[in-house]
Amino acid sequence: MTDLTSLTLAEARKGLADKTFTSLELTDAHLKAIEAARALNAFVMETPDQARAMARDADARIGKGEGGPLAGIPLGIKDLFATKDVRTTACSKILGNFVPTYESTVTAQLWRDGAVMLGKLNNDEFAMGSSNETSCFGPVGNPWRREGSNTTLVPGGSSGGSASAVAALLCMGATATDTGGSIRQPAAFTATVGIKPTYGRCSRWGIVAFASSLDQAGPIARTTRDAAILLRSMAGHDPKDTTSVDIPVPDYEAAIGKSVKGMKIGIPKEYRLDGMPAEIEKLWSEGAAWLKAAGAELVEVSLPHTKYALPAYYIVAPAEASSNLARYDGVRYGLRVPGKSIGELYENTRAEGFGAEVRRRVMIGTYVLSAGYYDAYYIRAQKVRTLIKRDFEDCFAKGVSAILTPATPSAAFGVGEKGGADPVEMYLNDIFTVTVNMAGLPGIAVPAGKDSQGLPLGLQLIGRPFDEETLFSLGEVIEQAAGRFTPVRWW
């Protein structure tokens, strides 16, 4: 029998339906893989007993012909999603050993459809980071290494545990979240597929908040088909989330293999950065050529406010974060560090509970929201955001179906290599992805090639609001042309 962990989610679904193997066998194979891959530090909480119980239940349901769309499929869950009776910390000391008494809407829908939970996945603290180095559980290792090198690389962030676990074949797919690129950048760094759906497509209820107007849940998977299968279960209207949009969820899987003939693909001239590596430029041209060969039409488009996106994002996101993170005060749950007064208790708890990057962003956010600077920074950033959104609207109004860009400005870098002295160096990782969150649009990252050192590189497709289907169709064209890449096992 093939090693069960090497199957795609779609292949595993067929094997379970055909009774070639059971969910318990599939789950056990992944639990063994997780145990053998602890050096990657992808999981911060393993739930083997719960996983086996869920797998047995799935097998019973499949036996009766009552299995749901994800019956028996073992998944990893980012530690930002509340999981009932299972520790959820957002990878921050301040949440301590917090155990939710409720389930996030997205994970509840996965369990409704029969999925199995293998455990909780590592991420940057409160999803603030682009390398998964800010987690209180320590950094995550990327399953990929440079050819001939033993240097451990970052998997990207903030959903680094999700991307690493999927790439290392520790789970068949994973939940993730994306505020400025936290699904797409790790996917590009690990040769996995990651989609950030349109804002409002997936419920945010029960997900630890970072920046509420930007956060969106989505899947990281091995293939575009697998990502489409997962997104169908994760998406849907939720009355508990006022930003959730009440529109039907299409069958995303049906978009896989659909013709892209006649589609107009925008190539934005503003994404050609000064000093952009030749490998990224070449990859972008190759991706465009593949789409053209499949019958799509390439058109140059302009997104003139792109250059303001990153500074505007790093005002809006910290501003919302400083407000959202005010609730962690040591009074109701999580860490409490005593003080002589209530004010001192707050100060001590937050100083000890938050890591350096979270403290930095809370300070930036508080500063830009303060009386003297609110108009100069926050209001101006919101105006820029409106202009960015308008750029995309103008582009789509001209008949463009999707926009093709690089996913990241480079391949994965070494743990500890960036952002030590200058956080802006780390923030520049989000240069191609933040515009999508600022405009609330869907974006997918698909593996498209490797750099000269054998590291994966990804391309990004940006779609019209609620048109994730087109992204899956186009993404699959790139996937078929580029082929699939798997890392050489070192862990």
Swiss-Prot record:
GO terms for biological process: translation. The keyword Nucleotide-binding applies. The active site is at residues 78, 158, 182. One of its GO terms (molecular function) is ATP binding. It catalyses: L-glutamyl-tRNA(Gln) + L-glutamine + ATP + H2O = L-glutaminyl-tRNA(Gln) + L-glutamate + ADP + phosphate + H(+). PROSITE patterns: AMIDASES. It is an enzyme of class 6 (ligase). GO terms for cellular component: glutamyl-tRNA(Gln) amidotransferase complex. Keywords: ATP-binding, Ligase, Nucleotide-binding, Protein biosynthesis. Its EC number is 6.3.5.7. The keyword ATP-binding applies. Disulfide bonds: none annotated. Belongs to the amidase family. GatA subfamily. Heterotrimer of A, B and C subunits. NCBIfam families: gatA (TIGR00132). Allows the formation of correctly charged Gln-tRNA(Gln) through the transamidation of misacylated Glu-tRNA(Gln) in organisms which lack glutaminyl-tRNA synthetase. The reaction takes place in the presence of glutamine and ATP through an activated gamma-phospho-Glu-tRNA(Gln). This is Glutamyl-tRNA(Gln) amidotransferase subunit A. The lineage of its organism: Bacteria, Pseudomonadati, Pseudomonadota, Alphaproteobacteria, Hyphomicrobiales.
